Amino acid sequence: MLQINSRLAVIDGWLVDTVKRKPINFRSPEVRLLLPNDDDYKKLSQQNLVDWTRLKKDSNSVLVGVKSMELFKHIKLVLREFFLLEDGRIILKRIRSKLRYKVVKKLTCKCCRLYLPKWGTVYIHPMLKDKEKPLAGVCEFSLDVNPDREYPLIEINVSHQYIIIEGFLLYLNERRLYRWNDNNLRSQVGLTKWAHLRKTYNPVSLDILYSLNSNFYFVKDDLLFQLLGKRVFVKFCKVMENGKCGKAPLWYRVKRTTTAKATHIAYAISNSTAPDSFKSKNNDYRFIVREKPIVENTISNLDYSDIKKQQFTEAEVVKRKISADISQIENVHTQFNSQKEKNNIRVNKVSSEVLDQISKFPVSRVTLLLMSAGQDKNYIELVEELARRLEKICIEKTTQSLEEIRDTFQANPEMQASFDKEYYQSIEEYKITLELIKEDLLITLIKQMENMWAAEKKFSTEEEYVSPRFLVADGFLIDLAEEKPINPKDPRLLTLLKDHQRAMIDQMNLVKWNDFKKYQDPIPLKAKTLFKFCKQIKKKFLRGADFKLHTLPTEANLKYEPERMTVLCSCVPILLDDQTVQYLYDDSIIPEFEATSSYATKQSKCGRKMSLQMEPDLLFQEAIRRMRHLTAYDVLRRNYIAAFEELYMGNCND
């Protein structure tokens, strides 16, 4: 270090104001004011000083490492949070909304801010040389989230999502923590499932925190802080608590502080959100503290082993008491609980890697599945937009049908009031059912739309004219005159083709027609040329849960429902040598959904007949039955498929 005057010094090429403890740009006009003596200024100009503009030119990031431990001993450092982007840049956390690149890592370090008038702001931080030890109180940290770790994701009626991390129950929709022993939560989940989840995951950490005399609770998993978002900087301090016999035992508490003095990060919880029995007049906040320090504080005389022991000892006592209280509540409520639990509760596993990609909750299971599969962000957004359109179409159609039933009671306000209770409940239930149908069908429908099905057989794609009348294409021999496929072993070919033409056919990898006898259902194919040159007929089939076509049921097989599942499909018939007929169809074409219009007409006639002929009580019961039918899973599932076909055919026509 070279001392220029009583205030300025040069340290490893950096001009430092030792009074204000900050670096100074030697090109700044204030340098001359601080060095009125010409000799001092001349001595400074002879030094090989760092050119600040090179810092920005040499780096695309705002965080720049400097290999000078001596420099950072004489300047002030503040704690700042940064994002490491997938293109290698490091930027300040607060400008994340402007990003176009994925955040790879979140990091925090103590650094010093430098302002360059033409180049903007950069932050310098200490970068170690070989065999150098880090400065006391200066080290980098980042939230260390294991991308493969999985967590229980609890869904209540699809639209409410919770996650459990180290015993803390986090309501993802609002990024807010919940106590497990909460009356509203218990009624929402239902007593039976509430008790089961408690025994499986025991998410009572927030209940414990509110019951502690200490105002802090350690957490190891950084994902909790990442999801909660807003963090505060804290430090531990010793206090003397009043004890028995005049003794004053040593006690540790957490206190908010500045970034320069912080040793840990934490999430602050206001005591105003705690139950009245847990509120403390002396402390406004309690803190969930990240167990790993953000700095190695070698100056502090605090013993962290004592701090952890304090929490562990106190928490174990509180945990046993809370478990006993909750068990008692479960026993009491179980004896008097006769209500049927109607809410739809599901528990799934979700990885932290997937959670890190989600900016807003709730998120559908379809989106979670696509994220887990590593699908592109733009593709996922398109799927979500398609899902919104399908949901809108289904809701509009179902609501219209329900409104027609509701209008039946316009002349009887008392009966309409009774019906409205069932009506509004049905609306809530069918929206949940639609979400479940989306999870069951949407991805399968998209795969069908994208023509991603694999054919039942891999046929040859060669195209070659054997004669002006016969064409080989898609593994078939096509008779262009009769516009149909013909069996390569057909005896008629002996007179219709010459010897060398038949020899040519024998050398080709064509479909063996005897193989078709193995199939009872129509066969899906990817064979554009075949369907182009062959005559097709319209035939009714049944579409199964796998979206493939099946033959109509016989008397021995009545498990299908023909009116609901029947579709009309274009297909190519082929006559086998045992005089049975097999059907080939293009699996990239969505068949016509035949049952929709006839079914709607039937329901409409039934509705008019019902409203004209029934007594009021019977009319009410029949209206409830019809409403339940319209909001049933099978009916909504059929409407969802029809809506998809409507969108698909609309895009095709465009």
UniProtKB/Swiss-Prot annotation:
The lineage of its organism: Eukaryota, Fungi, Dikarya, Ascomycota, Saccharomycotina. One of its GO terms (cellular component) is chromosome, centromeric region. It is found in: Nucleus; Chromosome, Centromere. Its main location: nucleus. GO terms for biological process: heterochromatin formation; silent mating-type cassette heterochromatin formation. This is Regulatory protein SIR1. Keywords: Centromere, Chromosome, Nucleus, Repressor, Transcription, Transcription regulation. Interacts (via OIR domain) with ORC1 (via BAH domain). Interacts with SIR4. Interacts with CAC1. It comes from the Eukaryota. Residues 322-654 are annotated as: Sufficient for interaction with SIR4.
